[in-house]
Amino acid sequence: MPNFTDVTEFTLLGLTCRQELQVLFFVVFLAVYMITLLGNIGMIILISISPQLQSPMYFFLSHLSFADVCFSSNVTPKMLENLLSETKTISYVGCLVQCYFFIAVVHVEVYILAVMAFDRYMAGCNPLLYGSKMSRTVCVRLISVPYVYGFSVSLICTLWTYGLYFCGNFEINHFYCADPPLIQIACGRVHIKEITMIVIAGINFTYSLSVVLISYTLIVVAVLRMRSADGRRKAFSTCGSHLTAVSMFYGTPIFMYLRRPTEESVEQGKMVAVFYTTVIPMLNPMIYSLRNKDVKEAVNKAITKTYVRQ
């Protein structure tokens, strides 16, 4: 029986086998990817050059945008290539690398969202101490935790994936390499890997989501005690955008990973993964900027400076 090291490449079955839809999908997802890059890289640049955006909230937001760029870029280019290719293959090494970065960036993002919730708690519940407690040094330390932890956990998970055995079926029923479809085509004793995947995902999503929920529960209590209606409105507006992003980001991976990888669940997971890997990274810059007065002012100032220089 061949083991995982005997595999040289996998075939990605993708979203559809209908040739007439593949060109349409290519155009749509290419447009989505371009908008994702433009929006998130634009957000990073805007935050770095705008004096009014030099606060912890926007510092963390720039890292969320960076994670979104990494997340989308890990999946979309290969998906676009396979939509126009007849072979639709991915190398063994490429599959492991894609698995590694996918798991890593997912964990980075969920904990960045938790850090952002904690930051909003500090700003809303401890406004007088916010400047001293959330110094630049503290922010750097807080944001380093998701990166170190995410890439460390991903290394362990990917090494476990490396130990899977395959018995001649090298077709992955997905448009990128991920644990659920790989487990589905693996043979031998895969139940330990299944349980490990569910436990790791469950622990991390539960812990990070608990930080978010506790932070926002305390924020709501603090906001309701405010006497100023404008203050309450501003606080809820700022928190609303973050809660929207949290709801979208946590909901889809929970649906994908906290189930046994059956054929039906993998098919459903593909549809969810399209939203998760392409649409959410595109929407995040819009969610955080459309109702944000500071971001709008920064954009207007940046545009004005550009025209003045010309």
Swiss-Prot record:
<keyword id="KW-1015">Disulfide bond</keyword>
<feature type="transmembrane region" description="Helical; Name=5">
    <location>
        <begin position="195"/>
        <end position="215"/>
    </location>
</feature>
<feature type="transmembrane region" description="Helical; Name=4">
    <location>
        <begin position="138"/>
        <end position="158"/>
    </location>
</feature>
<feature type="transmembrane region" description="Helical; Name=1">
    <location>
        <begin position="24"/>
        <end position="44"/>
    </location>
</feature>
<dbReference type="GO" id="GO:0004984">
    <property type="term" value="F:olfactory receptor activity"/>
</dbReference>
<feature type="topological domain" description="Extracellular">
    <location>
        <begin position="74"/>
        <end position="97"/>
    </location>
</feature>
<feature type="transmembrane region" description="Helical; Name=7">
    <location>
        <begin position="270"/>
        <end position="290"/>
    </location>
</feature>
<dbReference type="GO" id="GO:0005549">
    <property type="term" value="F:odorant binding"/>
</dbReference>
<keyword id="KW-1133">Transmembrane helix</keyword>
<dbReference type="Pfam" id="PF13853">
    <property type="entry name" value="7tm_4"/>
</dbReference>
<keyword id="KW-1003">Cell membrane</keyword>
<feature type="topological domain" description="Cytoplasmic">
    <location>
        <begin position="119"/>
        <end position="137"/>
    </location>
</feature>
<feature type="transmembrane region" description="Helical; Name=6">
    <location>
        <begin position="236"/>
        <end position="256"/>
    </location>
</feature>
<feature type="topological domain" description="Cytoplasmic">
    <location>
        <begin position="216"/>
        <end position="235"/>
    </location>
</feature>
<feature type="glycosylation site" description="N-linked (GlcNAc...) asparagine">
    <location>
        <position position="3"/>
    </location>
</feature>
<feature type="disulfide bond">
    <location>
        <begin position="95"/>
        <end position="187"/>
    </location>
</feature>
<keyword id="KW-0812">Transmembrane</keyword>
<feature type="topological domain" description="Cytoplasmic">
    <location>
        <begin position="45"/>
        <end position="52"/>
    </location>
</feature>
<dbReference type="GO" id="GO:0007186">
    <property type="term" value="P:G protein-coupled receptor signaling pathway"/>
</dbReference>
<comment type="function">
    <text>Odorant receptor.</text>
</comment>
<keyword id="KW-0675">Receptor</keyword>
<feature type="transmembrane region" description="Helical; Name=3">
    <location>
        <begin position="98"/>
        <end position="118"/>
    </location>
</feature>
<feature type="topological domain" description="Extracellular">
    <location>
        <begin position="159"/>
        <end position="194"/>
    </location>
</feature>
<keyword id="KW-0807">Transducer</keyword>
<keyword id="KW-0472">Membrane</keyword>
<dbReference type="GO" id="GO:0004930">
    <property type="term" value="F:G protein-coupled receptor activity"/>
</dbReference>
<dbReference type="InterPro" id="IPR000725">
    <property type="entry name" value="Olfact_rcpt"/>
</dbReference>
<comment type="similarity">
    <text>Belongs to the G-protein coupled receptor 1 family.</text>
</comment>
<keyword id="KW-0297">G-protein coupled receptor</keyword>
<keyword id="KW-0325">Glycoprotein</keyword>
<keyword id="KW-0716">Sensory transduction</keyword>
<feature type="transmembrane region" description="Helical; Name=2">
    <location>
        <begin position="53"/>
        <end position="73"/>
    </location>
</feature>
<protein>
    <recommendedName>
        <fullName>Olfactory receptor 5M9</fullName>
    </recommendedName>
</protein>
<dbReference type="InterPro" id="IPR000276">
    <property type="entry name" value="GPCR_Rhodpsn"/>
</dbReference>
<dbReference type="GO" id="GO:0007608">
    <property type="term" value="P:sensory perception of smell"/>
</dbReference>
<feature type="topological domain" description="Extracellular">
    <location>
        <begin position="257"/>
        <end position="269"/>
    </location>
</feature>
<dbReference type="GO" id="GO:0005886">
    <property type="term" value="C:plasma membrane"/>
</dbReference>
<keyword id="KW-0552">Olfaction</keyword>
<feature type="topological domain" description="Extracellular">
    <location>
        <begin position="1"/>
        <end position="23"/>
    </location>
</feature>
<dbReference type="InterPro" id="IPR017452">
    <property type="entry name" value="GPCR_Rhodpsn_7TM"/>
</dbReference>
<feature type="topological domain" description="Cytoplasmic">
    <location>
        <begin position="291"/>
        <end position="310"/>
    </location>
</feature>
